[in-house]
């Protein structure tokens, strides 16, 4: 009985240490929720943490990883499968991203949502001020203070109902 108790005690002490390793260099990726409603309390965009795996300073690598899509089943990729990052340019606080042409498969509204997610991801990685995203003939520029990036619709609804 004492052996069983000692074995049980050892397992209780050591098994919690066997859980997944904490991320050493986490980055935050932003994606649209699979199911959302505009103006809902949860919002349209959510985030997940990913491991930078020694590439914390390699924006091209991290954004290429982003374009593969989310690991969570609750999130979806904002851009069609096969979208690639063609170029990244940093100048002062402005980051310019060039993507493959998505005009045939993404509406303007979907492209704007994708740009908001990609901008939030890029700004969280770089600490920049503004992101310009081009895809074919479309180009969207969003800054850190862009209203598109701020979902305060539930806050104003709550204030109006009081």
Task: Enumerate the language-model features and the residues they cover.
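Bimodal "functional hotspot" detector
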Residues: 3-8, 12-13, 17-162
């Amino acid at each position: 009985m004492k052996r069983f108790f000692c074995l049980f005690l050892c397992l209780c002490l050591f098994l919690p240490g066997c859980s997944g390793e904490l991320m050493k260099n986490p980055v935050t990726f932003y994606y649209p929720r699979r199911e959302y409603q505009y103006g809902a309390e949860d919002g349209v965009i959510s985030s997940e943490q990913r491991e930078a795996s020694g590439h914390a300073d390699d924006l091209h690598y991290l954004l290429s990883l982003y374009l593969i899509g989310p690991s969570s089943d609750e999130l979806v990729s904002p851009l069609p499968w096969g979208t690639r990052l063609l170029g990244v340019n940093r100048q002062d606080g402005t980051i310019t991203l060039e993507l493959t042409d998505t005009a045939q498969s993404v509406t303007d509204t979907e492209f704007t949502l994708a740009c908001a997610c990609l901008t939030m991801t890029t700004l969280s990685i770089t600490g920049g001020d503004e992101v310009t995203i081009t895809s074919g003939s479309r180009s969207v520029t969003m800054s850190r203070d862009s209203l598109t990036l701020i979902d305060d619709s539930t806050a104003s609804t709550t204030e109006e109902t009081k």
